[in-house]
């Protein structure tokens, strides 16, 4: 089945187990929100799914392709997973458009820039493409972060 699948994911920091045998399936096209108390492992699970954190135990598959497991780690840029954290993590020295294209395989290509502008249009931020993050309100910065995820 297409989608994100986590199988038996466990993770520890300095011997403190924060994830213990977690299994989760998110069908393709679904939007998911993880809820739980501070420190319960939500962000760690997301970081493992996206490839930002090395998997210690278990397996992560996307569209039936193993992304992480014993002896395998596909880098984040090849996983096609977008995350939006509380801190929007916009780069202050980059324009809004450059923030949206950052990390993509060919950020300066016409196609990438066109697609990024489409995403900025979806969140009503295309007119701010050449501005820098400090010139935007918090809500506007959040919409830029959403465009980057999309």
Question: What are the residue ranges of the model-derived segments?
Answer:
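ABC-type ATPase nucleotide-binding domains, specifically the catalytic core motifs of the NBD
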Residues: 32, 54, 94-113, 122
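ABC ATPase NBD Q-loop/coupling interface
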Residues: 59-79
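Conserved ABC ATPase signature
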Residues: 73, 132-136, 140-142
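Hydrophobic anchor residue at the start of the ABC signature
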Residues: 146
């Amino acid at each position: 089945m297409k989608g994100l699948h986590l199988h038996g994911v466990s993770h520890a920091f300095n011997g403190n187990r924060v994830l213990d045998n977690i299994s989760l399936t998110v069908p393709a096209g679904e939007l998911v929100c993880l809820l739980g108390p501070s420190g319960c492992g939500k962000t760690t699970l997301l970081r493992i799914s996206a490839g930002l954190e090395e998997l210690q135990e278990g397996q992560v598959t996307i569209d039936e392709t193993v992304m992480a497991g014993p002896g395998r780690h596909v880098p984040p840029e090849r996983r096609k997973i977008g995350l939006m954290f509380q801190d929007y993590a916009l780069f202050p020295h980059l324009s809004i458009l450059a923030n949206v294209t950052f990390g993509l395989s060919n950020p300066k290509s016409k196609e990438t820039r066109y697609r990024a502008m489409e995403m900025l249009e979806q969140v009503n931020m295309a007119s701010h493409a050449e501005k820098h993050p400090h010139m935007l309100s918090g809500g506007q910065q959040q919409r830029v972060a959403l465009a980057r995820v999309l």
